[in-house]
Amino acid sequence: MRVPARYRSAAAAVELFAAANFAFLALDIFLAHSVNEFARWEEWIPFGFSIAAAPLLLASFLAGGFRPRGARAARALGLAVGAAAVAVGVSGLLLHLDSAFFERQTLANLVYTAPFAAPLAFTGLGLLVLLDRLVEAAEPEWARWALLLALGGFVGNLGLSLADHAQNGFFRKTEWIAVAGAAFAVGFLATALFARSDRRLLRACLGVMAIEAAVGVAGFLLHLRGNLEGPGRTLWDRFLYGAPIFAPLLFANLAILASIGLRGLIAAPAPES
């Protein structure tokens, strides 16, 4: 079957999106787990997996070209990477919760423990890689699944924004912007999934995603300024123990993924009445 160019480019964009995110996660995890100097051996697992997953996905992309589902080697390699990523994410979630929350199920332990939802980034990326190999990009279901994964990411981002900023009691009013932004994204994307044939709504959601990306960049700059001006003997200490420098960029990241799904739904044929 000949796949239209716009769908081939969408599948390729998701492949490169996933590979870039795995590479980025390696840096983010190294910084996060350096806080306790990788006290537990299993903290090295997501770091090592991220380093390996990025080139493996690129190799899969080179083997499969614009159709990772169509080439046997690319499909097998991608399925293995995707399944492993899901396992790493779920096990990381359980380990993060086990650090305090499973001992005493309190809101304080949920807020001040390791970020419980952070490992689910692996699960989301793994599911995205699996999607590219199990569903043809030309099918409307592909765009809906991509949008659903973006929605799930924003739900997790909402929880992370609440928990992270609750640690300092929302000291600055601007910290509420992240919570409101994530909540708006959840509302709009959930509506888009149920009213996916409404082209005007889908285009409005694209505008909302542009705002979400701006929120992410603004948050990154605010975290950067806070770390540069914050206490700490060295610049490394300020970034290590200060505001998580890369966390706000999750808004921009998810906005890109959601936009890919939204554009796929806009380009899909209108359902027959």
Regions picked out by a protein language model, each given a short descriptive name:
Residues R69-A84, V88, L95-A143, P271:
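Membrane-interface helix-loop-helix junctions at boundaries between adjacent transmembrane segments
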Residues P4-R8, G65-R75, L134-A143, F194-A204:
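Membrane-interface helix-boundary motifs at transmembrane edges
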Residues G48-F61, P115-R133, A180-A192, I245-L265:
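Hydrophobic cores of alpha-helical transmembrane segments in multi-pass inner/ER membrane proteins
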Residues R104-A108, E229-I245:
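Short, membrane-exposed interhelical loops at transmembrane-helix boundaries
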Residues L27-V35, L62-G65, L94-Q105, G159-N168, ...:
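Juxtamembrane "helix-exit" motif on the non-cytosolic side of transmembrane helices
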Residues R75-S91, R144-V155, A204-A218:
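Transmembrane alpha-helical segments of multi-pass membrane proteins
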Residues A11, L31-A52, L110-A117, H165-A183:
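Transmembrane alpha-helix entry/boundary detector in multi-pass membrane proteins
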Residues R2-F17, E141-W145, A267-A268:
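N-terminal membrane topogenic signal
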